[in-house]
Amino acid sequence: MLRKLTSNSSRWTTTHLGSLWQEVGGHPIRRGLILHHHCRPLAAVSSGVILRQKEESRWSPNSGGKLANLRCWPEYRLHSATKRRTLGELVLRDYSSNNISDKKPEPKSLLQSIVQNPYARLMRIDRPIGSWLLFWPCGWSIALSAPAGCWPDLWTLTLFGAGAFIMRGAGCTINDMWDRDIDGKVARTRNRPLVAGELTSADAWFFLGAQLGVGLLILLELNWYSIVLGASSLGLVIIYPLMKRITHWPQLVLGMTFNWGALLGWSATQGSVMWSACLPLYVAGVCWTIVYDTIYAHQDKVDDALLGIKSTAIRFGDNTKLWLSGFSTAMIGGLVASGMVCEQTWPYYSAVGVISAHLAHQIYSLNIDNPTDCATKFISNHQVGLILFLGIVLGTLYKGYSQRAGKSSTTSSSSTSSSSSPSSGLLLAATNHHQPARQAS
């Protein structure tokens, strides 16, 4: 709790730091501190509370109650476990009226306005990496199902790309609705729209319904086998956010959810799932998800441990790299098995080799105690998905080229052997010798 100065008098009132707006002299300040010119010690503020600067402003004692420039450090912790701060240490004040600025903020571009919209942030438009990670298993399966020498079906790829974008947004909405009581206590998630009060639960329900409606329209473009198969994954989408409260393996459930496209992509193009090819691909994708989402979870492991949230990052602990190496090896094994069933060629296996090196570098250089490094390594998995997709496409094209070259070689050798055979030549000569006699008779 902090004390704030009201706009119409000099008396102090007590208000919570988390309140969104405070009117002073007619100026709304969001998540800032409105302070009297006397600094008072900050007796007790819960650890992890962060001051965010919405507008630069200072309190001037000679301004007649108007707002001049009070400044707060953005994302500055009020106190940590080892040191307690006072308001004098946190606030920079300048009482000179010459520093008062009437400069208006620069207008936002259309793209900025869209990205910063609370509904857009609810579905993580500003962070497209999740949509890519959801799309790549679909793309792998669609490309593997293409006939030898053919490109993957562009229309199917487009449908699955749109579906990945929409359903990832729906999954994020469901996740935020389940985790509303938790997100406000975690530094990385405390500014999400539902926690910050920018959207209500009713808004989120309405938006979720709209996203699921669009997702259903996309699903109805597929065959009935794929419609049933796709709809059966909705249960995983709903229960995943609950798993972090129940088990240390929520990343396993996320992997089962995110890689459903490895099954669905094949059925969308072929009418059913070829399990001998798709199941190893699906298992490989699940292992891949456990790898990258464990890295991601290490960003929040301190807050998660305090709140009782479970994850593979907490389960693996200091043995994380050993576990990640095991799951990476299983992923490579699944990719090799799927490639063998599909009779893939050297471009595919070359891509698998590059992915092996990429994952090895990720794990070797990973600093699990550095959130920035964890975020960088997590995002780099987009490259893993792209490399494998290109390897499948090039391998399929090369397979068609090899088959055509083999047929041409077989036809040529057969023709050569027929024309050079002595018995064939004698038979042809005998046939030509007796042909006029048959015509005369």
UniProtKB/Swiss-Prot annotation:
Chain ranges passing through the membrane: 129-149, 154-174, 204-224, 225-245, 246-266, 271-291, 322-342, 378-398
Keyword Mitochondrion: yes
A GO term, aspect molecular function: 4-hydroxybenzoate polyprenyltransferase activity
Location, primary (coarse class): mitochondrion
GO biological process: isoprenoid biosynthetic process; transcription by RNA polymerase I; transcription by RNA polymerase III; ubiquinone biosynthetic process
Documented EC number(s): 2.5.1.39
Ribosomal protein recorded as keyword: no
Domain of life: Eukaryota
Span of chain positions assigned to the transit peptide in the UniProt entry: 1-95
Compartments (UniProt record): Mitochondrion inner membrane
PROSITE patterns, A to Z: UBIA (PS00943)
GO cellular component: mitochondrial inner membrane; RNA polymerase I complex; RNA polymerase III complex
Composition bias type Polar residues, residue spans: 432-441
Region feature (Disordered): 405-441
Pfam families named among the record's database cross-references: UbiA (PF01040)
Biological pathway: Cofactor biosynthesis; ubiquinone biosynthesis
Membrane topology according to the record: Multi-pass membrane protein
Record's catalysed reaction(s): an all-trans-polyprenyl diphosphate + 4-hydroxybenzoate = a 4-hydroxy-3-(all-trans-polyprenyl)benzoate + diphosphate
Cofactor requirements of the protein: Mg(2+)
Family recorded in the similarity comment: Belongs to the UbiA prenyltransferase family.
Function text: Catalyzes the prenylation of para-hydroxybenzoate (PHB) with an all-trans polyprenyl group. Mediates the second step in the final reaction sequence of coenzyme Q (CoQ) biosynthesis, which is the condensation of the polyisoprenoid side chain with PHB, generating the first membrane-bound Q intermediate.
Protein name: 4-hydroxybenzoate polyprenyltransferase, mitochondrial
Natural source organism: Aedes aegypti (Yellowfever mosquito)
